[in-house]
Each structure stands twice: as structure tokens, then as C-alpha cells.
A protein has these predicted regions:
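Internal helix-turn-beta structural module
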Residues: 26-107
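A glycine- and small/hydrophobic-rich beta-loop-beta segment
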Residues: 1-21, 30, 34
Length: 107
């Protein structure tokens, strides 16, 4: 298990919907796509991730083709990916901004 904190940066290349936490989870998913039994999550402690009403995402590694993941990453449209495949986390505004927190768990 890896637990991490901080605020990742995203180089915006498209005009999609998403935030740095959703994008980070999608980037990690692309990297570990061929591994088994891994859970990835990253959330904004203030409850707002980028230009969405979600705080982040949670997903298990799966069989989604890297080409599909790359399409959503190229347009910075991670929110649409998670709406389609599941995994969005919605906490609402927490009025508390410590930092982003994440988890990568091998089970």
C-alpha cells in the first residue's frame, strides 16, 4: 500500500472536464493496466477537483485498453472517462483544504 499527499499538476492540452486527482488516477491506471489486483484513488480534501463537482476518483485496474485511456488523457477529459466507466467520488464542498490525498493498494 502506498499513501501519498500533495497537489499534482496537470498540463492542460484539451478543454475536457476533470481535475488533477481524476487525471492522476487515470495516468496511474494507464501505467499499471497490465497489473492485477490494484486499487487507485486520489481526492481533493476540499471536495472540489478541477472544473467538476467531484472530489476525485477511485478505480481498480481493469481491462480498458490503454488506447482508450490515452484518448481521454489527450483531451484532459478524465471526468468523462470516470462517468463512463465508474469511479467518481463526490463529497461536496468540505470547507477544509489540507491537500490532495491518494492511495495505491495491491491486494
Amino acid at each position: 500500500c502506498v499513501i501519498f499527499g500533495g497537489e499534482p499538476t496537470v498540463h492542460v492540452k484539451g478543454n475536457g472536464k476533470g481535475g488533477r486527482n481524476q487525471e492522476l488516477v487515470l495516468q496511474i491506471l494507464k501505467l499499471i493496466n497490465h497489473s492485477n489486483n490494484i486499487l487507485i484513488s486520489s481526492i481533493a480534501t476540499d471536495g472540489i477537483d478541477g472544473n467538476t463537482k467531484y472530489s476525485g476518483a477511485l478505480i481498480e485496474n481493469n481491462l480498458i485498453k490503454p488506447k482508450i485511456i490515452s484518448h481521454f488523457l489527450k483531451t484532459n477529459n478524465s471526468n468523462s472517462f470516470f462517468k463512463k466507466y465508474g469511479g467518481l467520488i463526490k463529497t461536496g464542498h468540505t470547507h477544509f483544504n489540507l491537500m490532495d490525498i491518494g492511495l495505491i493498494l495491491k491486494y
